[in-house]
């Protein structure tokens, strides 16, 4: 008789534990989605980048120079990771990302060749491919585009306006951004 009494108790225990775990998982997912809707915030990374999807691939990224900061979403394993960063377009319309002291940046270590990512500019999301640039001529072109853009949008403690003749530091990296369909 004591065995038949123990079964309902054990069954209730398993049910309560299962419901508790499912509730915690659901709360975690909802919390992450809310966090993704709010961040990246200044220097705090976020999750998914939400926004209106771009109409199609972009050939000329010149409009990026009209937006103070761009937002980038990569995947760190299976988890989305998004950040605010400087992006700039060259006069030819090529888009580059700016990364100072990049060896220490969490996101940069997770970007491989032909890395799929998402960019958000002014609320619109663009599927893109990232590639680190190491050729000095292309890096200089991206650096000059950065200097030009930051004459308008620079300022503040995290994004100072550079001297127009500033030289590209050795610790500065750049990534070329291209549209993907």
Could you say what each language-model-derived stretch is?
Residues 35-81:
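Short, conserved active-site entrance elements at the starts or edges of catalytic domains
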Residues 16-36:
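Hydrophobic membrane-insertion alpha-helices, especially the h-region
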Residues 23, 102-181:
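Short, structured beta-strand-loop surface elements
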Residues 66-102, 120, 127-131:
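Short beta-strand segments
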Residues 8, 55-57, 69-72, 101-103, ...:
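Short secondary-structure boundary micro-motifs
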Residues 1, 72, 97, 119, ...:
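Generic structural hydrophobic/aromatic packing signal, biased to beta-strands
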Residues 1-14:
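N-terminal Lys/Arg-rich, disordered targeting/topogenic segments
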Residues 61-62, 87, 165-166:
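Short secondary-structure boundary/capping segments
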């Amino acid at each position: 008789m004591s065995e038949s009494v123990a079964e309902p108790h054990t069954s209730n225990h398993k049910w309560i534990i299962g419901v508790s775990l499912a509730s915690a998982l659901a709360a975690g997912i909802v919390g992450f989605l809310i966090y993704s809707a709010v961040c990246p915030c200044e220097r705090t990374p976020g999750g998914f980048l939400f926004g209106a999807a771009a109409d199609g691939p972009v050939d000329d990224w010149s409009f990026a120079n009209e937006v103070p900061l761009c937002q980038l979403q990569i995947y760190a394993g299976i988890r989305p990771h998004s950040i605010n960063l400087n992006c700039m377009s060259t006069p030819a319309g090529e888009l580059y990302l700016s990364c100072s002291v990049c060896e220490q940046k969490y996101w940069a270590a997770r970007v491989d060749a032909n890395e799929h990512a998402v960019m958000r500019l002014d609320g619109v999301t663009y599927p893109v491919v990232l590639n680190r640039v190491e050729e000095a001529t292309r890096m200089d072109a991206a650096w000059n585009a950065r200097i030009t853009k930051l004459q308008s949008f620079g300022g503040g403690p995290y994004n100072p306006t550079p001297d127009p003749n500033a030289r590209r530091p050795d610790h500065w990296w750049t990534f070329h951004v291209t549209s993907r369909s």
